[in-house]
């Protein structure tokens, strides 16, 4: 089922691979239309509009996976490495559940900031915006460069599901397994244990 969806709609999946003609046509069409890059002042309203569109379509998330709904966007921000971002967002009501949801997005941002303080580990830049009663966690994509560049990426979920002898919820354990198979050097395995 996932492969069928990726073949039809996988134009902006993680990494550099695009599967199938339909997804490639969708990606090429998007590039020909030159998706607008949101200015710093337009970003909050742009994110709010994207969240509302996703909510009105009843889409719970994206092909990027995870428990929070999300979308990808292009935004201009001084000092950013790339305009490409993944944006997770909360709902916009005042319930306790939505408040916890918003708090978790903020905690994820703080965790990314904490990881960035470890000299030997690189982590994506992130920031939190609050607008229209929603919290938005914006994370720079490390698999994109410039407006059109795509870098290779294989998620840990994909590797575990297809290549590792067993799965783990522990990154350090997964790193040790990949090191034992010769896929990661000792430094990379140690970095995963640190995280």
Which residue ranges define each predicted feature?
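Phosphate/dinucleotide-binding and metal-coordinating scaffold of catalytic cores
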Residues: 1-195
